[in-house]
Amino acid sequence: MTKQAKLGGSFTLPGTPIKLVRMGYGAMQLAGPEIWGPPRDVDAAIAVLREAIAAGVNHIDTSDYYGPHVTNQIIKKTLHPYPDDLVIVTKLGARRGEDKSWLHALSRQEPEGNEQYDHASVRDVTI
């Protein structure tokens, strides 16, 4: 079993009862090369997530455009049902092109809006 690490202390989000360890885990590298597609070694990606949680990390930063969709799906597959104190944060509005490009973020004023992307991000990490 992993020894819980000293991760820089913790803080409570203002106005909430949510207490976060200062050191989180950024999930961008769970995706494949160029942050596209699945990782070369899915089992290793799963092991990294499990080790982060075992070390005391209680918040994960992710996004639906990592992969796209890949990191959120790996997080859900690995950690669901989620620990009560785990906080998953995401970014909304950005998109990836079919050519693996990083497209500009959508604004709420654009005709297609963010709704379809926002829903995909939430769908992939929730029950």
Label the predicted regions.
Residues 99-127:
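Glycine/proline-rich, positively charged
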Residues 1-90, 94-98:
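N-terminal binding-site loop/beta-alpha segment at the start of enzyme catalytic domains
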